[in-house]
């Protein structure tokens, strides 16, 4: 099987609040940075993957690329993990040689941003919004409350997720928030949607990034150390929160991660570094359990005991995560960027000797899941 790698990776020059940057400008800036990082030119790109709006064709046109393969898969924040998976398949099939995956989002400033509300004709708008499920915070609290009741997760354990990730952010000069926080600080912050406090909810920022994906053979001539894509997974559940099979676990997380681990041929003990989407503080708890790192009901205590923070035995969300680093609305691109930095040995808060990193994303609440197993060595 052809070895496919990430040969270039970069974010926009700035992330945070960028009122002078449109969504398209963020796409273009991240794309140019990633192509330069790979030591390539735009003329070397023959595949584009991007979430609309603006979409892959519009992004390609803005970059002066005439692709022979595109992917516009849009399933929320995990879309970029699926783009990587699809790019691997396209390169192996000969549909493209070098694929550029782009992201740009004016999540805070809303410059050129698409409307984010549920369309009136959608099942969500018809069957859930009338009962108070009006957006991500109120959607996510439904499974969280059930999990807390069933497994005894405490408010303090939930708050410890934000505390752990702020410790990583304190080591990252690009992180939006770096000041230390305590469990008490989290619980004293404003209630957003019970039981989630402000500091347990993701940031709302502007920014973007891009990835260059190609064969390992081609990457031999490029300047950056390649990051090998050992395994990928994707799967889906209902977009309706009410239709989850079990509020205390994500079936999509379980299936996508099992597929990626099997393809990569790794065990949980092989994993040195972990990035789990954290739009809200409980998602990494679900991730640790649904990916099989811990038995159900134990992840809250595991995080509260410090095992995922600097110096812990399972470093997780080492850029500070969506809770402290950045979160433009669709955060998955930034998960991958941090894994690439770790595997290149270039991270602000570097995990010593990291060789295998697992990236887990979700989209549309727990509707969609994508998993990547990445490494700085071949399988």
What label would you give each PLM region?
Residues 1-24, 160, 191-255, 305-319, ...:
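Condensing-enzyme catalytic core mediating Claisen C-C bond formation in acyl metabolism
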Residues 250-254, 258-281, 290-293, 323-328:
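Extended C-terminal subregions enriched in glycine
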Residues 49-102, 106-139, 177-203, 234-239, ...:
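Conserved catalytic cysteine-centered active-site region
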Residues 55-63, 241-246, 278-301, 312, ...:
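Short glycine/threonine-rich loop-to-helix capping motif typified by GTGT followed
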């Amino acid at each position: 099987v052809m070895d496919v790698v990430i040969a270039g990776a970069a974010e926009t020059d700035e992330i945070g609040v960028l009122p002078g940057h449109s969504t398209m400008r963020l796409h273009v800036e991240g794309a140019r940075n990633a192509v330069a990082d790979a030591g390539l030119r735009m003329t070397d790109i023959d595949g584009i993957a991007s979430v609309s709006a603006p979409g892959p064709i519009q992004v390609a046109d803005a970059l002066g690329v005439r692709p022979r393969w595109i992917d516009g898969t849009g399933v929320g924040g995990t879309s970029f993990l699926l783009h990587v998976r699809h790019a691997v398949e396209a390169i192996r099939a000969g549909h493209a040689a070098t694929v550029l995956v782009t992201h740009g989002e004016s999540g805070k400033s809303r410059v050129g941003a698409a409307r984010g509300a549920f369309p009136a004709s959608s099942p969500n708008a018809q069957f859930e919004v009338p009962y108070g499920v009006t957006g991500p915070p109120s959607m996510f609290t439904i499974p969280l409350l059930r999990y807390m009741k069933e497994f005894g997760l405490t408010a303090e354990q939930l708050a410890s997720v934000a505390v752990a990730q702020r410790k990583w952010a304190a080591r990252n000069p690009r992180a939006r928030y770096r000041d230390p926080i305590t469990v008490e600080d989290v619980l004293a912050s404003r209630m957003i949607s019970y039981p989630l406090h402000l500091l347990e909810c993701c940031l709302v920022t502007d920014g973007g990034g891009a990835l260059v994906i190609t064969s390992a053979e081609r990457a031999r001539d490029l300047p950056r150390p390649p990051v090998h894509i050992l395994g990928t997974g994707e799967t889906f559940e209902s977009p309706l929160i009410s239709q989850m099979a079990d509020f205390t676990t994500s079936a999509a997380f379980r299936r996508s991660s099992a597929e990626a681990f099997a393809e990569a041929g790794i065990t949980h003990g092989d994993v040195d570094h972990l990035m789990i989407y954290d739009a809200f503080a409980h998602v990494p708890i679900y991730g640790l359990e649904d990916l099989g790192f811990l038995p159900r009901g134990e992840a809250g205590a595991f995080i509260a005991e410090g095992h995922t923070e600097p110096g812990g035995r399972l470093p997780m969300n080492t850029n500070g995560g969506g809770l402290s680093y950045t979160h433009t609305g669709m955060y998955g691109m930034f998960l991958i960027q941090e894994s690439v930095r770790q595997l290149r040995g270039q991270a602000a808060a570097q995990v010593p000797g990291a060789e295998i990193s697992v990236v887990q994303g979700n989209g549309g609440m727990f509707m969609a899941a994508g998993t990547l197993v990445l490494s700085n060595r071949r399988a």
